């Protein structure tokens, strides 16, 4: 049954300003009512276009003998790829890691892929031994000051050591 709103009942006591104290500092600041309101809707990401197919299908068995599956999760150097790169769940990553380790122990997989590792090392060496810019022979004042302070410290250290040696000889 629908009940209508009850009418506002006036209090029997008369309103007196002297009894109530009005303290502005304790009152929270209220903005005036706005005539136009915007209703904000929460931002929802649509998962449809960004949906990626999982790397492990529902029928794939994570086993040390399933080499085609295991090879997807190993880098060119033979290292196990991280979860972030693989996009696997924790449980899947754990099972893959165990399968890779078991395959290595049973010599289905090498511990390292030496062919690709040699290529990788050759590239890194060529980058390091490439043409280097000439060092500037001009030494800034700060470096000279630092070197002179270091020389003074070394000299003082040597003097202290000599004094100790002389006192221990006596």
Swiss-Prot record:
Pfam families: Ribosomal_S18. SUPFAM superfamilies: Ribosomal protein S18 (SSF46911). Residues 27-55 have a biased composition (Basic residues). InterPro entries: Ribosomal_bS18 (IPR001648), Ribosomal_bS18_CS (IPR018275), Ribosomal_bS18_sf (IPR036870). Residues 4-52 are annotated as: 7 X 7 AA tandem repeats. Residues 13-26 have a biased composition (Polar residues). It is found in: Plastid, Chloroplast. Belongs to the bacterial ribosomal protein bS18 family. NCBIfam families: S18. HAMAP family: Ribosomal_bS18. This is Small ribosomal subunit protein bS18c. It comes from Triticum aestivum.
